[in-house]
């Protein structure tokens, strides 16, 4: 079963995040490309959620996640910081 949650990250953005599987299992984070959303990974998540805890965010600028203004808000180091912040946030919930 999958569920959606809105997560405020330490980077200042809120992302919609879909999860599936048991939090006790090893995690996998699925990251979509341009111009997709978490739905890119729905079939993989369904197939892997019995063995892994699957995490698929709608990254900044996509779907219902926050859409900060300005090109600087979408540079690679900023996007990487979002993923790291998501990882830290999920890890805090896992342990």
Residue ranges and their predicted role:
Residues 2-4, 40-43, 47, 78-85:
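Alpha-helical elements of Rossmann-like donor-binding domains used by nucleotide-donor carbohydrate transfer enzymes
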């Amino acid at each position: 079963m999958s569920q959606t949650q809105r997560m405020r990250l330490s980077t200042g953005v809120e992302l919609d995040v879909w999860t599936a599987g048991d939090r006790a299992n090893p995690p996998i984070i699925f990251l979509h490309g341009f111009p997709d959303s978490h739905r890119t990974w729905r079939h993989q998540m369904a197939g892997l959620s019995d063995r892994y805890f699957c995490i698929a965010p709608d990254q900044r600028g996509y779907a219902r996640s926050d859409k900060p203004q300005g090109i600087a808000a979408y540079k690679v180091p900023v996007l990487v910081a979002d993923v790291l912040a998501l990882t830290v946030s999920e890890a805090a919930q896992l342990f």
